[in-house]
Swiss-Prot record:
The gene is gluQ. Catalyzes the tRNA-independent activation of glutamate in presence of ATP and the subsequent transfer of glutamate onto a tRNA(Asp). Glutamate is transferred on the 2-amino-5-(4,5-dihydroxy-2-cyclopenten-1-yl) moiety of the queuosine in the wobble position of the QUC anticodon. Binds 1 zinc ion per subunit. It comes from Deinococcus geothermalis (strain DSM 11300 / CIP 105573 / AG-3a). The lineage of its organism: Bacteria, Thermotogati, Deinococcota, Deinococci, Deinococcales. GO terms for molecular function: ATP binding; glutamate-tRNA ligase activity; zinc ion binding. This is Glutamyl-Q tRNA(Asp) synthetase. GO terms for cellular component: cytosol. InterPro entries: aa-tRNA-synth_I_CS, Glu-Q_tRNA(Asp)_Synthase, Glu/Gln-tRNA-synth, Glu/Gln-tRNA-synth_Ib_cat-dom, GluQ/Sye, Rossmann-like_a/b/a_fold.
Amino acid sequence: MNVLPVVGRFAPSPTGAMHLGNARTALLAWLHSRALGGLHLLRFEDLDTGRVRSWAYDTTRRDLEWLGLDWDAEFRQSERLPVYADAVSRLTAAGETYPCTCTRREIRQAIEDSAGAPHGHEPVYPGTCRLHGAMPGRPAALRWHVPDGTVCVTDALTCATLCQNLPAEVGDFVLRRNDGVYAYHLAVVVDDALMGVTDVVRGADLWTATPRQVALGRALGSAPPRYLHVPLMTDFRGERLAKRGGAPPLRALREGGEEAGRVLSALARSLGWAVPERVSAAELLPLWRAQLTRAGFFINPQS
């Protein structure tokens, strides 16, 4: 039986300069693809054009190259709008979408009026426009009517399992915003399927979004990839590094004369790996293989 080749990806948003947290995730995604002899893709998630910075594409490439991370193909989501439109058309033809004109304020008010409460950090949409129809004359988003039942996913790195009842814990979510921009969850699911991505290494902040992405992929006829969620890098206050929070850019280290080997060593040591003061990305490959072995990771020939 033939084993499908591993295809991994790093998918940054070009909304600013990469910081050390982005770099660590990029490193781990690259290590995973290369340690398993697979292909590695670079995909710019740039659908929200209002937040995109044109210089960030080249800066990101330079940062990755400086760290010794290569890739086999490059994509921009902004150049792939027809494939997202096709996915939306298929879901709509199946009767699984509906227009929604609710504002965030109206959604929160509806939840309060029904004596409900937000789950986690986001309110669960109560299905107002599905039940009562969209408001005429307003710009409308497009929501996916999530299927009934519970979706469970198991992380291939941590072996943790997460089960979510989508209607109760997530609610019908947006596929296309009311300004016409396709939503992250739609684009990432469509792209991973069409690009043949088998393994997704990404930050732990996306763990709770995984069940809805798996469900959406199934609705579009695609099998889910393996998901490996890695810890986020935090500052001295324990808060995650973020572009919006003013995390120092990797570019400043690169342009300031810092050695890439020292940065890679610091990233590796932040994961608890014992490495020299200077190390190359290639020299970290055995450590990632060992990490996978300890996690009981395996490749399912039938996946």
